[in-house]
Amino acid sequence: MSSLGDQRPAAGEQPGARLHVRATGGALLLCLLAVLLGWVWLRRQRACGIPPGPKPRPLVGNFGHLLVPRFLRPQFWLGSGSQTDTVGQHVYLARMARVYGNIFSFFIGHRLVVVLSDFHSVREALVQQAEVFSDRPRMPLISIMTKEKGIVFAHYGPIWKQQRRFSHSTLRHFGLGKLSLEPRIIEEFAYVKEAMQKHGEAPFSPFPIISNAVSNIICSLCFGQRFDYTNKEFKKVLDFMSRGLEICLHSQLFLINICPWFYYLPFGPFKELRQIERDISCFLKNIIREHQESLDASNPQDFIDMYLLHMEEEQGASRRSSFDEDYLFYIIGDLFIAGTDTTTNSLLWCLLYMSLNPDVQKKVHEEIERVIGCDRAPSLTDKAQMPYTEATIMEVQRLSMVVPLAIPHMTSEKTVLQGFTIPKGTVVLINLWSVHRDPAIWEKPDDFCPHRFLDDQGQLLKRETFIPFGIGKRVCMGEQLAKMELFLMFVSLMQTFTFALPEGSEKPVMTGRFGLTLAPHPFNVTISKR
């Protein structure tokens, strides 16, 4: 009888078969062990006082289906998670808050995510504990594309504070100082008016006209120039940006966050994204180079000029500085992408709500006629005398909430929020859509009612709970400029036209298209000259 250590394969058995079986069994055992350890780890996390939430699955957490392309997601496996495919993530998370509370948590893989769904928890986190809740989560796709520079996605720290402080003060300068964008916005509206009137009484989509106008205002701010709506290079860059955002949000590019080297795959959306990056980079870097060649220290014309002058000042002081061409490039990208998409969609929502609510549109027309008349362009100085128009814009912002989940935050250290433990490195989602639909704060929150922003005397009522631009250290740095654009462009549109939906058309779906921003579904309007 042979010993156990001297066993030989039976007759006819392949020599490597037993080894293969043992290896397979060992691999399965390791997988089971990993699943068990993951399950134990997740259970321990729940026991450590973190906010309540659904039970996570081992390894994949609560949203494992998000790791799989939509067309490969089997319905039987998704269960309730499939609702994220039929409603926006902001709506789905708001529904979860009804079950688990205004502060709840879930896991994506092993990553803990905490969602804040009401104003009080948002204010405590972003204002009262701002130093803890102001970082950004590490995401390989974003890190590769931005080199962790710029303002929007950069990590919170001394360099970010320097760049943010300069950018914010420069934007304020353009909003209030001698380089104010007000006349440029009014000038741009002349092109909007001309483009819309070409359609006569025929239905048309306002999207390309509004998008071109808002993009040109950002170009005036950043580049000191505007582009004709028929300029092929300008249209191409806008198309690149739109396509880049689309494939980042709705394709297999999310796999880069799991395996960063996927970014370099030579096919599909991976290859397309790299080409889009190269084309946009070429466009922006050419403009920066032109500014360097024509820079006049005594007469800065735009954001790039101001940044280049500050760079020279820092270098002349012979001190280490974070101000360089790389940072300028990514900040310009932030301003262009974030500033164009959000304001464009806010204006589109305004036109849609006016088309659906002719009674409100009529009151806006009456206030414009009373304060401004028909013979002069609107000015920011008119704002104080136009509370109903302001309230209308604010109500559209509240209901549309074009950035429904804000940009994700991350905790830089362990903390406690309203009695719950929030570990260091937790991803924090701010559901601004839920904050602005909270029935505890907003009466009949789903109704369109501008009067909720007016007091008994018809004057504008400033509500602390109205935070469409966010709050805290990461509040939108372009808030003032966005408000200026929205007011001047909206009033100019209302002063000139009456908007309506085409006769016989169906009412557009008002849920919006969830992406980087919450855009209205495509719609057409008709106009009549006033």
Swiss-Prot record:
- Which gene is the coding source of this polypeptide chain? Cyp2u1
Q: Give the catalysed reaction(s), semicolon-separated.
A: an omega-methyl-long-chain fatty acid + reduced [NADPH--hemoprotein reductase] + O2 = an omega-hydroxy-long-chain fatty acid + oxidized [NADPH--hemoprotein reductase] + H2O + H(+); (5Z,8Z,11Z,14Z)-eicosatetraenoate + reduced [NADPH--hemoprotein reductase] + O2 = 19-hydroxy-(5Z,8Z,11Z,14Z)-eicosatetraenoate + oxidized [NADPH--hemoprotein reductase] + H2O + H(+); (5Z,8Z,11Z,14Z)-eicosatetraenoate + reduced [NADPH--hemoprotein reductase] + O2 = 20-hydroxy-(5Z,8Z,11Z,14Z)-eicosatetraenoate + oxidized [NADPH--hemoprotein reductase] + H2O + H(+); N-[(5Z,8Z,11Z,14Z)-eicosatetraenoyl]-serotonin + reduced [NADPH--hemoprotein reductase] + O2 = 2-oxo-N-[(5Z,8Z,11Z,14Z)-eicosatetraenoyl]-serotonin + oxidized [NADPH--hemoprotein reductase] + H2O + H(+)
Q: How does it sit in the membrane?
A: Multi-pass membrane protein
User: Which enzyme class, named as a word?
Assistant: oxidoreductase
Could you list this entry's UniProt keywords, alphabetically sorted: Endoplasmic reticulum, Heme, Iron, Lipid metabolism, Membrane, Metal-binding, Microsome, Mitochondrion, Mitochondrion inner membrane, Monooxygenase, Oxidoreductase, Transmembrane, Transmembrane helix
Family matches, as Gene3D superfamilies? Cytochrome P450
Summarize where heme binds, as residue positions.
Answer: 476
Q: In which tissues is it expressed?
A: Widely expressed. Expressed in heart, brain and liver.
Q: Which family does it belong to?
A: Belongs to the cytochrome P450 family.
- Major location (coarse): endoplasmic reticulum
SUPFAM superfamilies on file: Cytochrome P450 (SSF48264)
Instruction: Summarize the protein's role.
Output: A cytochrome P450 monooxygenase involved in the metabolism of arachidonic acid and its conjugates. Mechanistically, uses molecular oxygen inserting one oxygen atom into a substrate, and reducing the second into a water molecule, with two electrons provided by NADPH via cytochrome P450 reductase (CPR; NADPH-ferrihemoprotein reductase). Acts as an omega and omega-1 hydroxylase for arachidonic acid and possibly for other long chain fatty acids. May modulate the arachidonic acid signaling pathway and play a role in other fatty acid signaling processes.
Q: What is this protein called?
A: Cytochrome P450 2U1
Q: Which InterPro entries match?
A: Cyt_P450, Cyt_P450_CS, Cyt_P450_E_grp-I, Cyt_P450_E_grp-I_CYP2D-like, Cyt_P450_sf, Cytochrome_P450_fam2
Record GO cellular component, one term:
endoplasmic reticulum membrane
Obligatory cofactor(s): heme
Q: Which GO terms describe its molecular function?
A: arachidonate omega-hydroxylase activity; heme binding; iron ion binding; long-chain fatty acid omega-hydroxylase activity
Q: Which organism is it from?
A: Mus musculus (Mouse)
Q: What is the E.C. number? A: 1.14.14.80
Regions that span the bilayer: 21-41, 99-119, 247-267, 328-348, 481-501
